[in-house]
Amino acid sequence: MAQDIFMDPWQSATSFAMEDEDMGMPSGKYARMEDEMGENKERFARENHSEIERRRRNKMTHYINELAEMVPQCASLGRKPDKLTILRMAVSHMKGIRGHTAQDETSYKPSFLTDQELKHLILEAANGFLFVVCCQTGKVLYVADSITPVLNLKQEDWLQRNLNELIHPDDQDKIRDQLCGSEVSVNKVLDLKSGSVKREGASTRVHMSCRRGFICRMRVGALEPLHRLRNRRPLFQHAGQNYVVMHCTGYIKNAPPQGINAPASSCLVAIARLQVASMPVCADPTSTNQFSVRVSEDGKMTFIDARVSDLIGLSSDQLIGRYWWNLAHPADEKTLQDSFVALLSDQPMRINIRVRTSTDYIPCTVSAYKFMNPYSEQFEYVVATHQIAPQEDINNWVTAPTVPQPQASEFGELGGAPSAVDYGQSSSGGWRPEAQGAPQAQWQWDPMNGYNQ
């Protein structure tokens, strides 16, 4: 009985194999099928994992590219940054935003100013206005009311009008390139002196991001109501219209779709500011009896207001490059020179002197200040304003107390009124007094040889 119950394992396996052979199936087929099924499962698992990883990498690349467009530091780069650089700049940008928001916003506004007064001050300082243009149609969708003090135009003059109608015809191609966002464009340079657009043959990649920055000439309204428009330089004219140089900075913003099948649209959001070179240099543009001079550290005049020719009869080309104190009466040269040295030592300057004209000397009040570079805190230049005394105050005029040394001046004899011969040019290029009895002569400008009689 016990022998019937006991079964040898080897005999059992042998009996099963014999049964499979009796049924016509080889003994190793099950093992091969199991191996093939295992290999297929591993292959399918690997392929599925690779597909999942590929999709994950594509999504990560897409989000990082969107992040690069949102971070200003990445958008300002001239090349496409790598992913690590994008993440690093994004973290830095977020830290900066968090640092700004942590501060109290009310600390930026003085307590004695209302919100409306602060708004007007900001608009006056910015000297610009905000506008929005549709990239597909070129129509102006929005313009701020601050356009009136800048261009002397109303909002209705811009709204729903094509931007090409509001800018100089020579700048229309440039604006079209900025709106379309093409990757390759021909370089176009605006010459501020001639007003023409120069084309360079080389092609370049102009738009690496959604940010935009360009200079164009915009139409202005009537020049008479606002003195700021009358003194704005340079002014361009075309077909009876006046144009002024504006610097536009902004970015391209994608608008949400209007429907399921609606085409994608975008718009340019930008701020237009007056070009710095277009603004008058003097502090009070309405004043007709003063002119400004910019003086370098060595005392030479590097810039002179164009109104100097109307006030003293000498053009700015004749004075630029000369020493500032050579413009004064010989008896006042030392006073002006000493005041200039004191001004460089952070001392205030306001003196009464006599300045040279083409035929005589006239009294004026000179006030000056020293301009320092706000970034490097280094000396840049001195800005001096010459206020010509009114005719009724000339008799009561008192110059700054000084005892001049009896010496000859570059312009003529001591204390004498200048004549036209005082402005002759020597072979060395300096101004010299001519011999007594020399024939009278006027300055004549020779582009090749300088000043000739």
UniProtKB/Swiss-Prot annotation:
GO cellular component annotations of the record: aryl hydrocarbon receptor complex; cytoplasm; nucleus; protein folding chaperone complex; RNA polymerase II transcription regulator complex
Mutant lacking the gene: phenotype: Abnormal cell morphology of developing RMEL/R neurons. Arrested development at larvae life stage due to its requirement in the pharynx. Defects in SDQR neuron cell dorsal-ventral migration. Aggregation behavior is diminished. Abolishes guanylate cyclase gene expression in the URX neurons.
Domain annotation PAC: ranges: 348-392
Entry keywords, A to Z: Developmental protein, DNA-binding, Nucleus, Receptor, Repeat, Transcription, Transcription regulation
Ranges where the PAS domain occurs: 115-193, 277-347
PROSITE patterns referenced in this protein's UniProt entry, alphabetically: BHLH, PAS
Gene Ontology annotations of biological process type: cell fate specification; determination of adult lifespan; intracellular receptor signaling pathway; neurogenesis; positive regulation of transcription by RNA polymerase II; regulation of transcription by RNA polymerase II; response to xenobiotic stimulus; social behavior
Localization in the cell: Nucleus
Region annotated Disordered, chain positions: 410-453
Source taxon at top rank: Eukaryota
Xref: Pfam families: HLH (PF00010), PAS (PF00989), PAS_11 (PF14598)
Expression by tissue: Expressed in many cell types throughout development, including hypodermal cells, intestinal cells, pharyngeal cells, and neurons. Expressed in every cell during embryo.
The protein's role, per its UniProt record: Transcription factor. Efficient DNA binding requires dimerization with another bHLH protein, such as cky-1 or ahr-1. Regulates transcription of target genes, probably acting in complex with cky-1. Has a role in cellular differentiation. Required for pharyngeal development. In collaboration with ahr-1 it is involved in RMEL/R and SDQR neuron cell migration. Acts in the cellular response to hypoxia. Involved in aggregation behavior by regulating soluble guanylate cyclase gene expression in the URX neurons.
Subunit annotation: Interacts with hif-1. Heterodimer; efficient DNA binding requires dimerization with another bHLH protein. Forms a heterodimer with ahr-1; binds DNA as heterodimer. Forms a heterodimer with PAS domain-containing protein cky-1; binds DNA as heterodimer.
Descriptive protein name: Aryl hydrocarbon receptor nuclear translocator homolog
